[in-house]
C-alpha cells in the first residue's frame, strides 16, 4: 500500500508532498482552527504527564513511519494541546486566532528565510522597516530605529544593553571592566525580565533598584527620584529607568510624563515596557493611558498579545537615529555582510541584533493590518475595553464575587468567595482559606476542559483570579459562562 511507505520517500515527489500537506492542512483547519475556536469544544484535554507520554509515543526511532501514521500523529498533537484561540482561554496575555495573521505565519514558515540580509529576504527587510515605522508613528516619533525580537523579555534586555552601551561604549570591547557599579530602576510591578536581564547582562540583580508602586500598581515618581539620589549616594551610577504600560497582573499604566521628567533631570535612559499595553495606542478613546510615551528612548511592544498577531511578534522601538543598534551589536561578519555587494548594504539589517539567523515576524502583523486596517484594529481594542466593563458590572451583581480593584485595563482581578466563606471576612483564617480556593477551581476547570484562567497571590492579598479580556471573538456569553462555571465548580467549597 502506498500509505505504508516511510515519508522519506516523498523527497523529490511533488505530487506526494502536495497530497500530504493538503491532508495536514485539512486536519489543522478542522481540529486546530474550527474546533479549537468553538465554544462548544473543550479548551484542553488534560492528561497526567506519564499518560500523555504514552499517548504521544514520543520516542524517536531509526525507521520512518507511514503517511497515515504521521497524519494520526498530527491529530493527536492537536487533540492534546491547549487551544489558545478558544474563546474561553483566559489564561495568558495572548489569546485568539486572527486568520490573516495565521496566513502570514503559514507563508513565513513555508518560505523559511532569515531576516538578516536583503539578498535572501528582500520582501521582509522592506516590510519590517515599514511596520516598525508605523509602530514608531503611533508612539509619536517621526524617525528612529527598531527591530523585531524573539519576545518582549528580549526587547527589554536589548533596551538595557543599548542604554549601557550609550553611557559606556567601551563596555562592548572591555566588558564589565569598563563599568562602574551601575543602577537601574523599575517598579515592583515590573515584568520579571528586567531582573533576569540584569543577571544576563552581567549587571547583577543587586543593580535593580525597586521603586514603590501605589495601590493600583503604578510607579510612584517621587520614590523613583528618592531611589536615584540614594543610589548615587551609595556609589552607584544610575543609567536606566524602565516604566511599564500594562503590568502583567493588575494591568497598571505607570505615569510616563512624570517619570520622563525624572529621567530628564538625571540624564537617564527612559525605557517603556509596553509589551502588554502598547496596542492601546491604536485606540483614540484609550491611548491617553500611555500619555508621555513619546518621551521614551525605547519602547517594547508585543502585537502578539492584545492584537492577536500570533506568537511571536515583539517589537523594540527606538527614538535613536544614530545607528545605535548596529554600533552596539555589530560585528561585521565578512561572510554575510560584505561591503561590496551589488545593492545598498544599508538594507542588510542583521548586524543590528545579537542573533545571526532571525525569524521573520513582520508578515503576520502586516497582513493582518492590511486586512483589518487601523480602524479595524482600533475596534478590536475598544471592544476589549467594553467587554471588560461588562465583566466588572456582572461581578458586582453576583453574590460570591469580589473585585480586587477597579481595572484600568483589560485585566480583571477578582476573588470567587465560595459559600462556606461568605460573611466570614473577619475570621482569622479567612485569607488563608480563601487562598486555597483558586488553585482548587483551576484544577477542576482544567481537568473538565471547560476554560482556563490564571490566578496568583499579590503582596498580602490571597490568591485571586486574573481574567484577561483579549480574544477578538470573545462575547458577553463567554463572560456569563466564566462566572457561571466558577459558581458551578465552587458550589461545594
From Swiss-Prot:
Gene that produces this protein: Csad
Name of the protein described by the UniProt record: Cysteine sulfinic acid decarboxylase
Assembly, per entry: Homodimer.
Enzyme Commission code: 4.1.1.29, 4.1.1.11
UniProt GO MF annotations: aspartate 1-decarboxylase activity; carboxy-lyase activity; pyridoxal phosphate binding; sulfinoalanine decarboxylase activity
Record-listed N6-(pyridoxal phosphate)lysine modification sites: 305
Top EC class of this enzyme: lyase
Organism: Mus musculus (Mouse)
Tissue expression as described in the entry: Expressed in kidney and liver not detected in lymphoid tissues and lung. Expressed in kidney, liver and brain. 7 and 4 times higher expression in kidney and liver than in brain, respectively. Low level of detection in skeletal muscle. Expressed in brain, olfactory bulb, liver, skeletal muscle and kidney with the highest expression in liver and lowest in skeletal muscle (at protein level).
Key word Coiled coil present: no
Listed GO CC annotations: cytoplasm
Pathway(s) where this gene product acts: Organosulfur biosynthesis; taurine biosynthesis; hypotaurine from L-cysteine: step 2/2
